[in-house]
Amino acid sequence: MVSRGPDEWLETIKKCQALTENEMKQLCEMVKELLMEESNIQPVQTPVTVCGDIHGQFHDLLELFRTAGGFPDDINYIFLGDYVDRGYYSLETFTLLMCLKVKYPAKITLVRGNHESRQITQVYGFYEECLNKYGSTTVWKYCCQVFDFLTLAAIIDGKILCVHGGLSPEIRMLDQIRVLSRAQEVPHEGGFSDLLWSDPDNVEAWQVSPRGAGWLFGSKVAREFNHVNGLNLIARAHQLVMEGFKYHFPEKDVVTVWSAPNYCYRCGNVASVMKVDEDLEPTFKIFSAVPDDYIRESTANHNNQRAGYFL
């Protein structure tokens, strides 16, 4: 058989067809090498499109690209993590994003979410999906090695911090993120974990999160963090927003971007991407779920019993 390369892999995965185990090994090695060169806070220039959780909703990811204006050959993208779990095409979703990273390394930034974790993916679907599709856990292990090298944050023109979850009482300055050791499984607590797990909420300062990891943080915390670090905005994902995006706090200095429409194929929400031009004024493009026969068939054929953690 003639060996195929990244261009052929991309054309295959665009059709929602999985790569071979050996191709996945090669792809993951290529992506790891690219990610090793990136900093914990990857600088990105405008114009850029920021995308929230995808959660294995492959056909909706294709709709996201259509909504945003195309693949990264023309547009800079930042994805805020949670590529896998819950949806039925986590493997194909993450494979597509990795193929795009290889083809357009400077045009797409992949931030780590709390689901890019060995522990979480063994509970919420990605581990089981890889086992079912390949007959072994080998490809899952390759992908988990990539997870360990995903960047923790991105910063747009030095003014908009992009992170999966939120802030940490252990992190006051951006430089404290830059010196974290990220090439590891997500810790159970501490600054690294908090970046992936925390949520903005109507609390005075800090409050223990009901998720069991990370913190709830209030408007005063966000305002002080942005002031100290010269930021205009924190863009994050991590929480389902029925309207696709949501500004938090009176200052509108934290925004949630959610990019998985009709989440879990049943929530009925719309999704959004956040476009940021040179003026640093965000605008949002809303899109709905694709009424896809593949998804309906998969939904009917899958056991939808998952553990209780939902958002």
Swiss-Prot record:
Keywords linked to the UniProt accession: Cell cycle, Cell division, Cytoplasm, Hydrolase, Manganese, Metal-binding, Mitosis, Protein phosphatase
An annotated Gene Ontology molecular function = protein serine/threonine phosphatase activity
**Superkingdom of the organism of origin:** Eukaryota
Question: Which GO BP annotation is one of this protein's?
Answer: regulation of TORC1 signaling
Q: Which residues bind Mn(2+) 1?
A: D53, H55, D82
Q: Name one Pfam family in it.
A: Metallophos
Q: How is the cofactor bound?
A: Binds 2 manganese ions per subunit.
The subcellular localization recorded is:
Cytoplasm
**Quick check: keyword Transmembrane helix in the entry?**
no
Required co-factor(s) are:
Mn(2+)
EC numbers on record: 3.1.3.16
What the protein does comes down to: Involved in the dephosphorylation of the large subunit of RNA polymerase II. Is required in late G1 for normal G1 cyclin expression, bud initiation and expression of certain genes that are periodically expressed during late G1. Associates with the SAP proteins in a cell cycle-dependent manner.
The UniProt similarity line reads: Belongs to the PPP phosphatase family. PP-6 (PP-V) subfamily.
Name the record gives this protein: Serine/threonine-protein phosphatase PP1-1
